[in-house]
From Swiss-Prot:
Belongs to the paramyxoviruses nucleocapsid family. Disulfide bonds: none annotated. One of its GO terms (molecular function) is protein serine/threonine kinase inhibitor activity. Its main location: virion. The modification Phosphotyrosine is found at Y38. Encapsidates the viral RNA genome by forming a left-handed helical nucleocapsid that protects the RNA from nucleases. RNA replication depends on the availability of soluble nucleoprotein. The encapsidated genomic RNA is termed the NC and serves as template for transcription and replication. Together with the phosphoprotein, sequesters host NF-kappa-B in inclusion bodies (IBs) thereby inhibiting this host defense pathway. May also act as a modulator of the innate immune response by sequestration of host IFIH1/MDA5 and MAVS into IBs. Homomultimerizes to form the nucleocapsid. Binds to viral genomic RNA. Interacts (via N-terminus) with the phosphoprotein P (via C-terminus); the phosphorylated phosphoprotein P binds to N-RNA complex. When in a monomeric RNA-free form, interacts with the phosphoprotein (via N-terminus). Interacts with protein M2-1; this interaction allows the association of nucleocapsid with the matrix protein. Interacts with host EIF2AK2/PKR; this interaction inhibits EIF2AK2 phosphorylation of EIF2S1 and blocks EIF2AK2-mediated translation shutoff. The gene is N. It is found in: Virion; Host cytoplasm. It holds the Pfam family Pneumo_ncap. It comes from the Viruses. This is Nucleoprotein. Tyrosine phosphorylation modulates viral transcription and replication.
Length: 391
């Protein structure tokens, strides 16, 4: 698709139409939604930790538990507000800790469980029982279990949410094609944590988050706001720092990118879907200004439904002008700019980034659905080596 066929005016007209609507809709989150408060945060963190210490853990419910932990960090009131602001009709279920009795091998045992509508007491107890087996094995191996290997280490919940941060912007693909990239990145950035916990299996945890976000789209809104709040909070643990880096890179710079309002998906990394044959910086400035008008998360929620309208502005994030606009500029290598840029700083940032991409030679063209002419033009412009171009 040549860029000349994508008219910015088309997007502006749609924006005017949408802005003129006098009505709103209410979406349903289902019968009840669990909204844990700060007081159960420690228990949810421990539940995450139990999954992490369990060898060959079943991660079917890990995504859900991770999201409940994220909500407990936001707090009940803010979680409900986020959902209502996103147009959801919320029937909130308060979450408390209660005692649950279960017969195990003829002996009645007591367990502390949460009053969750989304996760039965039996499932919570089973998670604890399985984790105890692994903990006993760990005791035999280590003699004494160091704090960072225990299920109640304070960073357990955030370790799991690091994988959610990798999954979140892959959702625009509409399938799980980004799973391989998520696993590779998780294995790299969480390598120390993987050494600590045998149950930290990126593939299984990522699939669990995919499942949760696909079945409960309202949790996407919650997670995005949680990610922004968490990343903007100073201090915190090493894992919180990793989370902020992953979230801001994935959401701020984008593994789902601008291509003049047409969606381009990442197969490799942020240096990808920006091979545009007819890019001109005048259009980049227009796109940038329009994106500023739309605001922080504009477009993110609508990518699946309306790619052209989703400029994925992300102007609140520090990497926006240097990264996203470099991408939107078609690398600034695909076409020459004729005339004086209206925004010299913007032009320089995009140009510098484009040159860096060209020099590194790691652009992936396979995701762009290019015509034969466009592909030929790219080859002519970049003179890439055969291995640098994925077709």
């Amino acid at each position: 698709m040549a860029l000349s066929k994508v008219k910015l005016n088309d997007t502006l007209n749609k924006d005017q139409l949408l802005s003129s609507s006098k009505y709103t809709i209410q979406r349903s989150t289902g019968d009840n939604i669990d909204t844990p408060n700060y007081d159960v945060q420690k228990h949810l963190n421990k539940l995450c930790g139990m999954l992490l210490i369990t060898e060959d853990a079943n991660h079917k419910f890990t995504g859900l538990i991770g999201m409940l932990y994220a909500m407990s960090r936001l707090g009940r009131e803010d979680t409900i507000k986020i959902l209502k602001d996103a147009g959801y009709h919320v029937k909130a279920n308060g979450v408390d800790i209660t005692t649950y009795r279960q017969d195990i091998n003829g002996k009645e045992m007591k367990f502390e469980v949460l009053t969750l509508s989304s996760l039965t007491s039996e499932i919570q107890v089973n998670i604890e029982i399985e984790s105890r087996k692994s903990y006993k094995k760990l005791l035999k191996e280590m003699g004494e279990v160091a704090p960072e290997y225990r299920h109640d280490s304070p960073d357990c919940g955030m370790i799991i949410l690091c994988i959610a941060a990798l999954v979140i912007t892959k959702l625009a693909a509409g399938d799980r094609s980004g799973l391989t990239a998520v696993i590779r990145r998780a294995n790299n950035v969480l390598k120390n944590e993987i050494k600590r916990y045998k149950g930290l299996i990126p593939k299984d945890i990522a699939n669990s988050f995919y499942e949760v976000f696909e079945k409960h789209p309202h949790l996407i809104d919650v997670f995005v706001h949680f990610g922004i709040a968490q990343s903007s909070t100073r201090g915190g643990s090493r894992v919180e720092g990793i989370f902020a880096g992953l979230f801001m890179n994935a959401y701020g710079s984008g593994q789902v990118m601008l291509r003049w309002g047409v969606l381009a998906k990442s197969v490799k990394n942020i240096m990808l879907g920006h091979a545009s044959v007819q890019a001109e910086m005048e259009q980049v400035v227009e796109v940038y200004e329009y994106a500023q008008k739309l605001g922080g998360e504009a477009g993110f929620y609508h990518i699946l439904n309306n790619p052209k309208a989703s400029l994925l502005s992300l102007t609140q994030f520090p990497n926006f002008s240097s990264v996203v606009l470099g991408n939107a500029a078609g690398l600034g290598i695909m076409g020459e700019y004729r005339g004086t840029p209206r925004n010299q700083d913007l032009y320089d940032a995009a140009k510098a980034y484009a040159e860096q991409l060209k020099e590194n030679g790691v652009i992936n063209y396979s995701v762009l659905d290019l015509t034969a002419e466009e592909l030929e033009a790219i080859k002519h412009q970049l003179n890439p080596k055969e291995d640098d171009v994925e077709l």
